[in-house]
Amino acid sequence: MFLELRECKARSNSVLEGSKDHKYSLFHTGGLLRRAEKMEAILMKAASFIAVIILGYGLRKAGFFKEEDFYVLSKIVLKITLPASIIANFSQAEIQPAMLLLCLVGFAGGVLYMSLGWILGGKDRDEKAFHILNMSGYNIGNFTMPFTAGFFGPTGVVITSLFDTGNAFICLGGAYSVASMAKDKNSRFSVGPILKTLIKSAPFDAYIGMLILSLIHVSLPAPAVSIAQLIGNANAFMAMLMLGVGFKLSGDKRQIGKIGKILSIRYGVAVVASLMFYFVLPLPLEYRQTLAVLVFSPIAAAAPAFTGDLKGDIGLASAVNSISIIISMIMITTVLIFVL
């Protein structure tokens, strides 16, 4: 009798253990499937952005777009679709005063890269000015914003916008003023031109305007938000198309070493910053995810133009800028796979 009871109990335990193993197996398999589906979704969305860039580049090569059409597309993005996207996404998010610290993070990143550029430029004033301009600043509005909007939604756009507000002081005049001072010992740092440039920047005006309205809890009328959403939805496509139309590689092949040095330091610092933001900062997950992506933004789009204004090597600056876009696409896609 006792032996029969023991055998029944043993069979029962065996069935229970088998059931547990089966449940664990199903749970583990389900988790892997969800992870694979998420990775596939990320790669598909990232691939769609890259496909639009390739489309723009192909259309320019085919003669559909001319090189000067880049400036027309740039005006549409910077003055219409990007400000509309900022307005639409800010209208869906709540801003806390503590979030303003993100502006300092964007500003600090620019200062760090300017400092590295100053050191790497050595004693040659032209080299110092070139490195300051072509290592600092982030191309966020034209490049990274579509990624953060597409993967992190309104909250991601707000975090990106606050980060870019601090970054704007660097890439829209700050780096140029410091580079001018480095090139000409008689030149002095001036805040006035930077502020004038910022005031004329439609995205920056949209950042500041929506930030103030959010902090004082004033909402835009529903029809205005609806129009902004309609226009803002085109921003990702227009920004990626613009990048494709404007993409070009030029410069002296003998200067590959200088390009490699600038980009290796730029992205080496970005890797360290991304890891620190994601694993160390005591912030909510979506903040850490967005910041981990933002630090891999390409070099500021205005850098080649500012380089030309200081009589620098425009071809080399354009090559550095274009290659940084390729690297950023790869790095941002990789980071998204790991953090989402």
Feature locations, PLM:
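Alpha-helical transmembrane segments of multi-pass small-molecule/ion transporters
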Residues: 20-340
